[in-house]
Amino acid sequence: MGICMGAYWAGQEYFDILEGADAVQYITRPGTDTRRPHPKAIDIVWQGQTEKMFFYDGCAIVGDATKFRTVATYANGDAMAVIQKRIGLIGCHPESEESWYQQPSWMRTHYHDGRHHSLLLNFANQLMAQ
């Protein structure tokens, strides 16, 4: 399982372990809702539920969508969290702690109160069941 930079490691620039897919910088993608890599809470859809999740220049998983199962997407529809066989990748930070949202102060209202930790645990359980 790779989160943020850990997900990038699965891509063609690094270990190249994905079948028919790549991990690419989300801020460079068509239709992205952000062009800046700085920490922020961005809109994602995780299994049908819209969330604001901590983002810090994370990756999108692109390629043949029949080769992986998409668990979450970014606002532009790119895959943000995927499972491919025994590989699980997440571009944002569901593991984020409350302290991550303290600076800058405008992010304080976006802390998830642990909801994202539950999403991450469910994701890990799905991955281990593969």
Residue ranges and their predicted role:
Residues 1-46:
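A glycine-rich, often tryptophan-bearing local segment used as a flexible ligand/cofactor-contacting loop or short
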Residues 2-7, 11, 49-58, 121-130:
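A broadly tuned preference for mixed-charge, low-complexity surface segments
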Residues 12, 25, 47-49, 84, ...:
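Residue-identity detector for glutamine
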Residues 15-18, 27, 80, 89, ...:
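Generic detector of leucine side chains in alpha-helical contexts
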Residues 20-22, 36-37, 88-89, 106-111:
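Short, low-complexity, polar/charged sequence segments that are solvent-exposed and flexible
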Residues 35-101:
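Catalytic beta-strand/loop cores that center a nucleophilic Ser/Cys/Thr
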Residues 86, 94-130:
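Extracellular ligand-binding/catalytic regions of CAZymes and related secreted enzymes
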